[in-house]
């Protein structure tokens, strides 16, 4: 639902960053990501490959509504589209350890975050570095990334 909005965000962000790469994931980060959402099943990139390609000096920005079953974050086998051998939390923690300048941008309004348990879990993992997709939210997010 947010793909076009996020594509516009990253199109605008290209002018702010020297090097910008983006990958898609569904709900939570797991062992594979993809560059083209229409080819998500046929052209996945291993998450470990992405982590080995970009150094710790890169900024890592996740964009998503963080709304999913808590099982998708907390348990192996919790993903709703495939069997994940490691929890989403494990992958998210690896990512934020790899890239200490990280951020989660949430396109849903901040008022709705309190109604979704998974949003609270992601905010906790991200040490409250979750901002709304608003001008003020993006300004706050840039402070987290610097």
Where do the language-model regions lie?
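Acidic, low-complexity intrinsically disordered regions
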Residues: 1-146
């Amino acid at each position: 639902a947010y793909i076009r909005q996020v594509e516009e965000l990253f199109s605008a962000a290209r002018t702010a960053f020297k090097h910008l790469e983006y990958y898609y994931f569904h709900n939570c980060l797991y062992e594979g990501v993809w560059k083209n959402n229409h080819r998500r099943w046929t052209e996945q990139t291993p998450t470990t490959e992405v982590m080995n390609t970009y150094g710790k000096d890169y900024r890592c920005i996740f964009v998503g509504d963080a709304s999913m079953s808590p099982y998708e974050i907390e348990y192996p086998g919790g993903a709703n589209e495939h069997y994940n051998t490691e929890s989403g939390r494990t992958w998210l923690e690896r990512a934020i350890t790899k890239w200490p300048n990280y951020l989660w941008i949430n396109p849903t309004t901040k008022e709705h975050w309190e109604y979704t348990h998974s949003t609270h879990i992601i905010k906790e993992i991200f040490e409250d570095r979750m901002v709304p997709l608003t001008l003020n939210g993006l300004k706050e997010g840039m402070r987290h990334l610097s």
